């Protein structure tokens, strides 16, 4: 799980205004950090299939959030993809 400090750092990097924790950019960045954490977890715990389902749900959630952002504002979408290094 993400530490509070790490989550706050992500929010500070992607926020649009003061107190912003719910913009698509922030949500996508937090989901990406959780996905990276779980991916590393599975390198050690190969048989943890229960958590693997959670990972797939997170990936789907991030995908939907990216699709939403792409339909609303293509420039913001491209910026987030570039900053996070997500293949697309």
Swiss-Prot record:
Stored CDD domains: Ribosomal_S15p_S13e
Keyword Plastid applies: no
Superkingdom of this protein's organism: Bacteria
Keyword ATP-binding appears in the UniProt entry: no
Entries under InterPro entries matching the protein: Ribosomal_uS15 (IPR000589), Ribosomal_uS15_bac-type (IPR005290), uS15_NS1_RNA-bd_sf (IPR009068)
One example of a Gene Ontology biological process annotation: translation
GO CC annotation, single: cytosolic small ribosomal subunit
SMART domains: Ribosomal_S15
GO terms of molecular function: rRNA binding; structural constituent of ribosome
Matching Gene3D superfamilies: 6.10.250.3130, S15/NS1, RNA-binding (1.10.287.10)
Family from the record: Belongs to the universal ribosomal protein uS15 family.
PANTHER family documented for this protein: RIBOSOMAL PROTEIN S15, BACTERIAL AND ORGANELLAR, SMALL RIBOSOMAL SUBUNIT PROTEIN US15M
Function: One of the primary rRNA binding proteins, it binds directly to 16S rRNA where it helps nucleate assembly of the platform of the 30S subunit by binding and bridging several RNA helices of the 16S rRNA. Forms an intersubunit bridge (bridge B4) with the 23S rRNA of the 50S subunit in the ribosome.
The name this protein goes by in its record: Small ribosomal subunit protein uS15
High-level lineage: Bacteria, Pseudomonadati, Thermodesulfobacteriota, Desulfuromonadia, Geobacterales
Gene for this chain: rpsO
């Amino acid at each position: 799980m993400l530490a509070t400090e790490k989550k706050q750092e992500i929010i500070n990097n992607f926020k649009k205004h003061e107190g912003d924790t719910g913009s698509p950019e922030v949500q996508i960045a937090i989901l990406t950090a959780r996905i990276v954490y779980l991916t590393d977890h599975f390198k050690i715990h190969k048989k943890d299939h229960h958590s693997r389902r959670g990972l797939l749900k997170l990936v789907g959630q991030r995908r939907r959030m990216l699709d939403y952002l792409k339909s609303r504002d293509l420039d913001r979408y491209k910026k987030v993809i570039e900053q996070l290094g997500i293949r697309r």
